[in-house]
């Protein structure tokens, strides 16, 4: 499975580089982002490695996982041209800008001084794996 993600990520990065690195891409509005994501599960990669997946539900609700079986429910909203997410257990918003590149979404975290982007590596209608709550014995 990891080989599949790596292959998809390499292909996506190749298209991104060949297209000029997204220099001409425009930041998505909230309505464009909603139209692109609603009802989908998107898998993201960063620097050649799988990063996480997010399921986009109705009413701007989301479910995020770092692909470790642990999923966090949350929601998103638009603020000052950015798409901001709040997840259960954290009240601090995580804000991003999104652009539609030749191979999918490109996400830039607004609080990242090194500006390392996330790239959509797979758009899927399939469910991501969310294990149940941890039970201590």
Question: What function would you assign to each model-found segment?
Answer:
Residues 10-19:
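Bacterial N-terminal signal peptides
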């Amino acid at each position: 499975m990891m080989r599949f993600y790596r292959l998809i990520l390499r292909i996506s990065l190749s298209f991104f580089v060949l297209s000029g690195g997204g220099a001409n891409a425009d930041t998505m509005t909230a309505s464009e982002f909603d139209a692109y994501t609603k009802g989908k599960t998107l898998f993201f990669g960063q620097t050649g490695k799988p990063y996480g997946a997010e399921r986009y539900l109705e009413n701007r609700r989301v479910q995020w996982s770092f692909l470790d079986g642990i999923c966090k429910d949350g929601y998103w909203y638009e603020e000052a041209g950015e798409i901001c997410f709040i997840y259960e257990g954290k009240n601090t918003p995580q804000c991003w800008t999104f652009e539609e590149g030749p191979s999918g979404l490109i996400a830039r975290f607004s609080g990242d001084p090194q500006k390392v982007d996330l790239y959509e590596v797979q758009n899927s209608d399939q469910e991501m794996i969310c294990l149940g709550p941890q039970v201590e014995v």
